[in-house]
Every structure is written in C-alpha cells, then in structure tokens.
UniProtKB/Swiss-Prot annotation:
It comes from the Bacteria. Belongs to the GHMP kinase family. IspE subfamily. Pfam families: GHMP_kinases_C, GHMP_kinases_N. GO terms for molecular function: 4-(cytidine 5'-diphospho)-2-C-methyl-D-erythritol kinase activity; ATP binding. It comes from Rhodopseudomonas palustris (strain HaA2). Catalyzes the phosphorylation of the position 2 hydroxy group of 4-diphosphocytidyl-2C-methyl-D-erythritol. Pathway: Isoprenoid biosynthesis; isopentenyl diphosphate biosynthesis via DXP pathway; isopentenyl diphosphate from 1-deoxy-D-xylulose 5-phosphate: step 3/6. SUPFAM superfamilies: GHMP Kinase, C-terminal domain, Ribosomal protein S5 domain 2-like. This is 4-diphosphocytidyl-2-C-methyl-D-erythritol kinase.
Length: 296
C-alpha cells in the first residue's frame, strides 16, 4: 500500500444536454444527460495513514463552507462503512472550481477522494463498494468517479460511454451560487409526474459514431436542450445574461447552461476561436469566472 502522498484531479462535469424525464414517487428525478468533463479542475491530495481530516486551500477555499459537511469526508466515511479497516488519512483540497455552479465541483472532489482511497487500499476504482459509496454520497458522484464522457440516465447512476472527441469550449460562471433544490422546485414537477418532452427522450436518435468529427458532435449536441434552464432563469436571472454574452461571441457554434446553473458553456470549432471568445468576455465581465479550454 502507498505510504507517500497521493494526488488526483477533480475535473469539472458539464451537462452538454439535460432532459428531466420526470419526478419519481420517491421525490427523486429521472434524467437523461450527455455528460463531458472539462480540462479545469480542483486538485485533491491524500496523505495516507494520518487521522482523517480535510484542509482547503486555493482561490475557492473561502466558498467551501463548513469542512465537516464536505462531500470528501462524507464519501470517505461511507466507504469506511463498507471496507473494514479502511486506510484513510489527511486530505488537502486545492479549490479552483466555483461552488453551487452546475458543474459538480463538490461531487468531483468526492469522486477524487474515492479514487485516492481506492489507490491507498489497493482497491479497483470500480469496486462495487467504491461505486456504492459514490452513489450514496450524491447524485453526481457516480458519473464523476470515472470522469469519462457518457450518457447518464436514471437518477445519475446508469452510465453509457460515449466516443466524444475533444470539444473546444468556453465555460462561464457569474460567481453567483444557485442551489439545485431551488431550481428543481421552480421546475415544479409533482411526485410521479412526467415532464413535457418525454416522447422526445424515448424517441431520441443515437449519438455520433466513434469517428465522428467535432462539427458532427456540435450539431448533435445543439439538437438537445437543458430542461433546467428555464427554471434556473426564474431562480437567478443572471443566467440569462451569461447565455446572451456567450451567444454573441464571434465563432460560437452553440451555448447552453450546465446542470442546474449558473455555469454556462459555449462550443467552438477551434481553440483559436475559444481563446478569442474568452478574451472578449474577460474584458466585458472582469468579475466572472471564465475558462477557455475543452470538454472531453
């Protein structure tokens, strides 16, 4: 078992599409979402063998809230309940991603913790006990565990891999937190109620093949939607400002909100267009969090 410090990235999750199929009788929502992961991330380090603890640092540390409630510790305790004599340790979280932002920052951190704990205890990352701990930690943690592009269905626990190419993208967050529960409340589905558009989900076409181009994928993603965009606009109207700013960029191919917001993204045909678009946004909105990179 490793005795030296272990480190891993916690990449931002982006919902390229997000359909809310309906609300189940248990109150959870069934979803269908094409998920990709960005090249921006938090970084989590584990010092194995020390007493379980978490220290946050980095530019986003002040937004993490009470350390005792952090999903890194929740995931660790859930795995410890399933793995006798689990070797944990001291975690250090270098926080860069915005919180309550629709990009699964806390979930990605928890997934990174589970991957590090698996390495520290000679477990496979897809060990059923690790996967179960991920599911119980939070709805976005299972998809963040492998952090690979996929179609996510059910309550986020059924993952079908997708051959997604590298998509040049700009991500923007206005530094305004949006609570997921408030957005789903604004959506207003009753328990057992199907959402408008269920027929579209059931009849949806397959996604591009393994050798499809970036242009083919952008066309396919553009045909989709995010059913949480409209309720998120009711909760926090600044989401509309972000979407309008992205849609106005030169060379933009499409723009959409991720998750329950407020982070939005825009896809481009080239890295050059992506970088140019980000510079335009930084000049116009110096207070926003802006990342120029890619999704894959």
């Amino acid at each position: 078992m490793p005795t030296t410090a272990l480190s891993d990235q916690a990449r931002a999750k982006v919902n390229l599409t997000l359909r809310v199929v309906g609300r189940r009788v248990d109150g959870y929502h069934d979803l269908e979402s094409v998920v990709a992961f960005a090249d921006c991330a938090d970084r989590l380090t584990l010092h194995p063998g020390a007493e379980l603890s978490l220290v946050t640092s980095g530019p986003g540390a002040q937004d993490c809230g009470d350390t005792a409630d952090n999903l890194v510790l929740k995931a660790t305790r859930l795995l410890a309940e399933r793995v006798p004599k689990l070797r944990s340790g001291a975690f250090v979280l270098d926080k860069h991603l915005p919180v309550a932002a629709g990009i699964g920052g806390g979930s990605a951190d928890a997934a990174a913790a589970l991957r590090l704990l698996a390495r520290a205890n000679d477990l496979a990352a897809d060990d059923p006990r690790v996967v179960e701990a991920a599911r119980l930690t939070g709805a976005d943690v299972p998809v963040c565990l492998p952090s690979r592009p996929c179609v996510m269905t059910g309550v986020g626990d059924t993952l079908t891999p997708l051959p997604l190419p590298r998509l040049p993208a700009v991500m923007v967050n206005p530094r305004v937190p949006v609570a997921t529960k408030d957005v789903f409340k604004a959506l207003g589905l009753r328990a057992g109620q199907l959402n408008v558009g269920i027929v579209d989900v059931l009849k949806s076409k397959g996604w591009p093949a393994v050798d499809a181009s970036v242009a083919d994928w952008i066309v396919a993603v553009r045909r989709g939607t995010n059913d949480l965009e409209a309720p998120a606009l009711k909760v926090e109207p600044i989401v509309g400002d972000v979407l309008r700013a992205l849609a106005a960029l030169p060379g933009v191919r499409m723009s959409r909100m991720s998750g329950s917001g407020a982070t939005c993204f825009a896809l481009f045909a080239s890295d050059e267009d992506t970088k140019a678009g980000a510079e335009v946004l930084r000049a116009a909105h110096p207070g926003w969090w802006i990342h120029a990179g890619s999704l894959s």
